[in-house]
Amino acid sequence: MYLQLLKSLNRVHPRAWDFIQLSRMDRPIGIYLLLWPTLTAVWIAGLGSPTLANVLIFGLGVVLMRAAGCCINDFADRKVDGHVKRTADRPLASGRVKPREALALFGILVAVSFLLVLCTNSKTVWLSFGAVALAFCYPFMKRYTYYPQVVLGAAYSWGIPMAFTAAGGELPASAWLLYIANLLWTVGYDTYYAMVDRDDDLKIGVKSTAILFGESDRMIILTLQMLSLGCLLLAGSRFELGGWFHLGLLGAALCFAWEYWSTRKLDRESCFKAFLHNHWAGLLVFMGVVLDYALR
């Protein structure tokens, strides 16, 4: 239904589908992975009763900035995507979209996102510049460091401190526990994603944590996931979250255990499924927070 709706936009403009694919709107998994931890922070910052304005601002902001990040990512990778089986048909790599068009769409999406942030307060506006900088820098990191997933984690977690400043103008130290938890989680699931392309990346000289971790990849991912849950548990104590939140963490832990088991053969398909599966862990943590506040 969702994809059919997007494809129907081709009736409005014959190239609409090219730009939908460029911004990955046809693949919402990235939206989910960014949305759940951001909304978790919005709920905690709002003490379980966030304003509708903040929910809409951060919800729409997630969609727009994730799309912007995909545009600049494909711009940065336009010369290497054609050499990777999974990405060879992307709009820029295949020539369906020009580099300047990708940059233009990136600029438009960032500008609209900034208009949303202007509806908050000055602290949140200033923090938003960090979000744009991280989104822009991430795609280029894989050329220079084996830790591009850490930069992605920093970018995907930036909405967390913004959610707190938007809610009350203050940024408590405990909010950074949520930030660190999400950064660790992101490095873990994006390493699964990088494992899908590891053989191709080795041939073309692209760096990633999947290459860095080598044969220890799955164990390191599981360790990162457990550390993430530990940070969430500590943050939950600071924010006085109880049983439902802990149940959400247990559900996430079971998700992580399944991912570790399911990738034991290290084939591309199972690694990609493990990456996709992570959004359920994020959703369970978010639902645990929502229910913990709602059922007090």
Curated annotation (Swiss-Prot):
Substrates-to-products reaction catalysed: all-trans-octaprenyl diphosphate + 4-hydroxybenzoate = 4-hydroxy-3-(all-trans-octaprenyl)benzoate + diphosphate
InterPro entries cross-referenced by the UniProt entry: HB_polyprenyltransferase-like (IPR006370), Prenyltransferase (IPR039653), UbiA_prenyltransferase (IPR000537), UbiA_sf (IPR044878)
Cellular component per GO, a single term: plasma membrane
Membrane topology (UniProt): Multi-pass membrane protein
Keywords annotated in UniProt: Cell inner membrane, Cell membrane, Magnesium, Membrane, Transferase, Transmembrane, Transmembrane helix, Ubiquinone biosynthesis
Class of the enzyme per the UniProt entry, highest EC level: transferase
Cofactor: Mg(2+)
Location of this chain's protein in the cell: Cell inner membrane
Main location, first listed in the record: membrane
Biological process terms in GO annotation: ubiquinone biosynthetic process
Matching Gene3D superfamilies: UbiA prenyltransferase
UniProt EC number: 2.5.1.39
GO MF annotation, one: 4-hydroxybenzoate polyprenyltransferase activity
Transmembrane residue ranges: 28-48, 52-72, 102-122, 145-167, 174-196, 219-239, 241-261, 275-295
Pathway(s) of this molecule: Cofactor biosynthesis; ubiquinone biosynthesis
Record flagged with keyword Cell membrane: yes
Protein's job: Catalyzes the prenylation of para-hydroxybenzoate (PHB) with an all-trans polyprenyl group. Mediates the second step in the final reaction sequence of ubiquinone-8 (UQ-8) biosynthesis, which is the condensation of the polyisoprenoid side chain with PHB, generating the first membrane-bound Q intermediate 3-octaprenyl-4-hydroxybenzoate.
Family the entry assigns: Belongs to the UbiA prenyltransferase family.
PANTHER family in the cross-refs: 4-HYDROXYBENZOATE POLYPRENYLTRANSFERASE, MITOCHONDRIAL, PRENYLTRANSFERASES
Name under which the protein is recorded: 4-hydroxybenzoate octaprenyltransferase
Source organism of this protein record: Pseudomonas putida (strain W619)
Gene: ubiA
